[in-house]
Regions:
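Short, charged/polar "capping" segments at the starts of alpha-helices
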Residues: 26-30, 75-77, 98-105, 139-141, ...
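Flexible, charged surface loops at secondary-structure boundaries
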Residues: 9-17, 30, 59-62, 85-86, ...
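Glycine-rich phosphate/diphosphate-binding loop of Rossmann-like nucleotide-binding domains
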Residues: 56-122
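A glycine-rich, Thr/Ser-enriched phosphate-binding loop motif common to dinucleotide/cofactor-binding enzymes
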Residues: 34-52
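Metallocofactor- and cofactor-centric catalytic cores in central/energy metabolism, strongly enriched
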Residues: 1-29, 232-242
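Adenosine-phosphate binding glycine-rich loop
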Residues: 154-242
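Rossmann-like adenosine-cofactor binding region
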Residues: 115-179
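Structural motif
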Residues: 22-25, 69-72, 94-97, 132-137, ...
Length: 242
């Protein structure tokens, strides 16, 4: 009720609470800036998600190209691009902020790293097999001529591509396995709150990517499967992608 909501808001303000993990029906009453979202974990597991996919497909990253859709120069996004650029044959950054990202590329990437910058709606994603979509919404994505069998990993927003021509995969979330000791630690909260949210309540998201990834590894967190707009994506779906 309204009284409980006001009490919650006052408590958050009084104690200067920075992160809130709560069940879905309460989320609408909490400031999104401090609300832990079930998708938050995905930006720390991009490499692991790609490793999961490549293992199923029997492919090697160093033989493939990676594409990034990005407009915001958030540190966590740039750290991910830098990490992944070392794993793939070429790195392709698709952005509407070309001049900004030209400076970023010059500052943070080694000379031997092959980076391509583009915003060509017709050609940029025509051959893209693996796309990490940091902050593009569906309206922006639909402006591009996208490879019909592309695999998209959507970080900020859930994306459902309605085009009948698209036969690829759009990944919107990750289903994680957490160890028994953490399940015991969370107790009855596991019944009402998404486990991704509960786990991320233990993580300091202000830290750099490497430290958070170390924490996830130490906590023995593993990917069970990936989730698309129709639910769990089967391994067979990944195997059929050329």
């Amino acid at each position: 009720n309204r009284r409980c909501v006001e009490k919650l808001r006052k408590l958050i303000k009084k104690d200067n609470i920075k992160q809130v993990a709560c069940e879905e029906e309460i989320q609408q009453y909490v400031d999104k800036k401090i609300l832990i979202d079930e998708k938050d974990i995905i930006k720390y597991l991009i490499l692991e998600i790609l490793e999961y996919i490549f293992e199923i497909q029997g492919k090697k990253m160093e033989q493939e190209d990676i594409y990034f859709l990005i407009n915001k120069d958030e540190d966590i996004y740039l750290e991910n691009i830098k990490t992944l650029s070392e794993k793939f044959k070429t790195t392709n950054i698709i952005t509407e902020e070309l001049s900004k990202f030209q400076k970023i590329v010059e500052n943070i990437f080694e000379e031997e790293t092959t980076i391509y910058l583009s915003n060509n709606k017709r050609k940029s994603l025509r051959r893209a097999k693996y796309i990490v979509n940091f902050d593009y919404g569906i309206g922006e994505i639909e402006k591009y001529n996208i490879n019909r069998t592309a695999i998209l990993i959507n970080i900020e927003q859930k994306v459902k591509i309605e085009s009948m021509a698209f036969e690829g995969i759009s990944i919107n979330n990750v289903n994680i396995q957490i160890p028994d000791e953490l399940i015991e630690h969370f107790g009855r909260m596991m019944e009402k709150i998404n486990k991704n949210i509960l786990y991320m309540s233990l993580v300091n998201q202000k830290q750099e990517l490497a430290r958070i990834k170390d924490r996830i590894k130490e906590d023995n967190i593993h990917i069970l499967n990936l989730i698309g707009d129709k639910g769990i994506i089967s391994q067979e779906e990944f195997k059929r992608i050329p």
